[in-house]
Amino acid sequence: MTVGNPTKLIVLFAAPLILANFGQQLYMIADAVIVGKGVGVEALAAVGATDWSYWLALWVIQALAQGFAIPISHYFGVGDQVRLRQAVAMSVKLCLLIGIALTAVCLLIARPLLSLLQTPEDIFGGALEYLLTMYGGILIVMAYNMAASILRALGDGKTPLIAIAIAGVTNVILDLLFVLVFGWGILGAAVATVAAQLLAFFYCFWELRKLDLMKIGKDDWRFRRDIAAGQCRLGFPLALQHILIAVGGMI
């Protein structure tokens, strides 16, 4: 990233990032299309009614992961491998804690949120079932986004895009299997999406394990207030920005 035409390098790095983030939102579009074909119009409407509610959580996760990865890219750039490993370890711990808390909050507010958005009664049950299942997979989504953000911080924007492409194809296959063959309906579509995200995480994790920089030792897992504070200062404002955008979309 420091040698060559800056504009070309930025475009080549940013394009996979944009496509990968957009790809995560396509999961729900695939779910909606297959559910609409296999179950019916009401099921299609139920999935569609959850769009902004789920994107709110997804965008918060993406923002936090990207913010937490900024110090990692800094330490990578200056060649400080010790602090880099510590920042990676701290990112994992923060994502685990925030992921658990976010999952609990989202599961609690799912029903009130759909009510607040005036979801029609005839599709409310299906929308709630889909949203609860998707919210139940928040830790998996956060794990993928953190792994992908770490890879990007190390200059690898292609692996997360490949992971999303593989997961996207898997999501469609599982949608067809769970919805049309097994007859699981809306629940099947949500389970397919969560499973596809899990596959995307495993792919990124597998690639990370190949890197010598990722040989994190026991001492690296110690809590370091300065690193955690720096990551939170970067991640939370980004998350707040995405929350405001999502709330605007809901309104």
Predicted regions and their residues:
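Juxtamembrane/interfacial segments around transmembrane helices
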Residues: Y144-A147, K215-F223, Q241-M250
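Small-residue-rich hydrophobic transmembrane alpha-helices
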Residues: A45-A104, V141-P160
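Transmembrane helix-bundle signature of multi-pass secondary active exporters and lipid flippases
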Residues: L17-I70, M134-V141, A229-I251
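Alpha-helical transmembrane segments of multi-pass membrane transporters/permeases
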Residues: C95, I150-L176, L187, V191-V194
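Alpha-helical transmembrane segments of multipass membrane proteins
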Residues: I29-A32, A104, P112, M146-I150, ...
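Helix-loop interface residues and adjacent transmembrane-helix termini in multi-pass membrane transporters
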Residues: I29, G38-V41, Y75-V78, A153-L154, ...
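Short alpha-helical transmembrane segments in multi-pass integral membrane proteins
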Residues: M1-A14, I72-L139, I173, V181-F236
